């Protein structure tokens, strides 16, 4: 009788183990892009759960970008579980020494030709609003000390 109980317990444990799926990690979609005009943009979205959702967020950003700017080069894209450097500062909305476009769930840092980077930042922020998001702003870097 105790072997029957043990067998039933092992069967139930086996069912539990095979149906249990661990929670997918929270990942941050990151894309780095370079334009032919000399702008380098780091794009960070809000964290999403799971690799599939993260890859979809990257695709949603990259496909329209490649259509709008076929000469732009996607330097890299990643789904990061931990952020460092520029990406961490963007995700946490910390001050940066570069121009930043901030909108709902999106942050972009932009580095480029000094005489044109401010106009680019303001233009992108305005375009984001025209595309349907409620607000977007260009955050200027702090003045040199």
Each predicted region: which residue ranges?
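N-terminal Sec-pathway targeting helices
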Residues: 1-12
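Mitochondrial intermembrane space
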Residues: 14-145
């Amino acid at each position: 009788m105790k072997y029957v109980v043990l067998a039933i317990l092992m069967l139930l444990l086996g069912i539990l183990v095979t149906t249990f799926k661990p929670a997918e990690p929270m990942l941050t979609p990151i894309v780095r892009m370079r334009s032919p005009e000399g702008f380098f943009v780091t794009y960070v979205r809000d964290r999403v759960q799971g690799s599939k959702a993260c890859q979809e967020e990257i695709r949603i950003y990259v496909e329209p970008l490649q259509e709008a700017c076929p000469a732009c080069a996607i330097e890299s894209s990643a789904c990061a579980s931990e952020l460092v450097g520029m990406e961490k500062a963007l995700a946490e909305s910390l001050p940066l020494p570069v121009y930043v476009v901030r909108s709902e769930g999106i942050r972009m840092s932009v580095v480029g030709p000094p005489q044109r980077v401010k106009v680019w930042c303001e233009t992108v922020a305005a375009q984001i609003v025209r595309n349907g998001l409620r607000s977007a702003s260009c955050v200027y870097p702090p003045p040199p000390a």
